[in-house]
Structures are given as C-alpha cells and as structure tokens.
C-alpha cells in the first residue's frame, strides 16, 4: 500500500514537472530576465527627451539582456492580470508581432511568456533598413545603413488573421488599426529609450518583401514598421 502511494506521488510530481523541463530544455526559447518595472525618468522628462535619431548612433555595443528585457516589456509586455499589456490595442486584437534582430540572430518576442523564440541565428539587421540609398526617391532623409550595425532593430509585423476582417462604417479597418497598434508600441519604446539614454528611430520605408521572405512570413502577416535602437555617439 505504501509503495503504491509513493509511486503515485512520484508519478504526479513527474507529470507536474514535465512542462518546466520542456521549457527549460527548449533550445529555441530564451527566457528573458524579469523586467525591472521600477525607476527610470519621470514621464514628463522622458517626453521632453524623446527624439528620433539616425546620424548620432554610436559604435555597435550589445544591449544587456536586462535592458532588452526591460525594453520589450515596455514595448508590449504584460502589466496586469488577464494578460493585459503596456500598449493599447484596437479591438483587443494584440496582433502586432515584435521581431527582434540583433548580431546574434532573429527572434520573436513572446509577451505572455516574456521570452524570445529563436527564428534564425543569422544576422539579418541590415534588412530592417534601406542600404546604400535614400529612404525615399528625392528625399533628404539620407540612407539607413545604420541599421546593419545598430545593436537592435525591432520589426513590427501585423497578423491580419486576428483582425477577422473587421469593418467600420463599411470599410475594412485592419491595416489602419494595425498601424495604430504598432504606433502605440513604438512610442512605448521611444519613451523607454528616452528614459535610458538610448538613441532610437522608427521607419516605415524598408524592403517589406525582403523582410517577409527572410522571416518566412505567411501571406496574412504584414511587416509594417521597423524601429532601430542604439547608444548615442560619444
């Protein structure tokens, strides 16, 4: 009798621990350190410091895992029960996927697990910008070559399946509201960077087809914005 009870207890413990070991041993998932949600500059000061920077990026220097964790949580992390986020989302879609491009590879942020899913170990940072050409024909915006050496680029991809073909006043609002959702996330990143003294810029002009191909996106997944983060030039 005692042996059967012990056996049952051991079996129950084993079954309970399976999810833990599965997650811990999954080489394609990187658990981020818990975000530091205290401190930082006051909101009004961060707003005063918020700016777009392209020509003042310093030499490549990797962000620490803690800084990356804090930044991604600020972007669209879970900040209260029921998996509600730091960024608002039209119709509660939460349809913006945040791809993370660093020198170490390409990752997909999982806000519910606060983890990174490994997509590729290839350095694809360069495709988040337009290399060797102006951002728009005849524009004075300059090139986006900085993207290939900046320590971090975020690529915002809209999962259009989550919009469910929603219409408002007879018009499909999927793309427009997805841009609004991505804009809210990007502003969170801007404010975090302002608070932490990091340089940052958002861009809508990039090779979307190349991104979709490299990331192996489904037709329903639309790359819409990229945002590059770096240290300021000293």
What are these regions (language model features)?
Residues 1-4:
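Positively charged n-region of N-terminal signal peptides that target proteins for export
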Residues 8-19:
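Bacterial N-terminal signal peptides
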Residues 20-24:
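Sec/Tat signal peptide C-region and signal peptidase I cleavage site
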Residues 25-150:
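N-terminal amphipathic, basic helical "cap/leader" segment at the start of enzyme domains
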Residues 50, 71, 98, 152-160, ...:
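Small-aliphatic-rich amphipathic alpha-helix that forms the alpha element of a beta-alpha
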Residues 130-134, 167-174:
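Short, surface-exposed loop/helix-turn segments at secondary-structure junctions
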Residues 160-162, 233:
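Active-site/binding-pocket entry motifs
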Residues 217-234:
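A glycine-rich helix N-cap at a beta->alpha junction
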